[in-house]
Amino acid sequence: MTKEQLNKARHQLGLTQAAMAAKMGIGTRKWERWEGGHSPISAEGATLLRLLVELNKQESGL
């Protein structure tokens, strides 16, 4: 996932970077590095993020 995709996903969920990190079960700094493009998101992290976005869409009725 690109940093733009990570940023878009976080905004779709309506979360701050700290809240997104907490929801993902990681530290804020790690999320900031992923979203800033300084380190790649793990495969597990990308899968969890996709699931969170999909769940949010379903709960929102989209």
Which residues make up each language-model segment?
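DNA major-groove recognition helix of helix-turn-helix/homeodomain DNA-binding modules
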Residues: 25, 40-62
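A short, Lys/Arg-rich alpha-helix, primarily the initiator
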Residues: 1-11
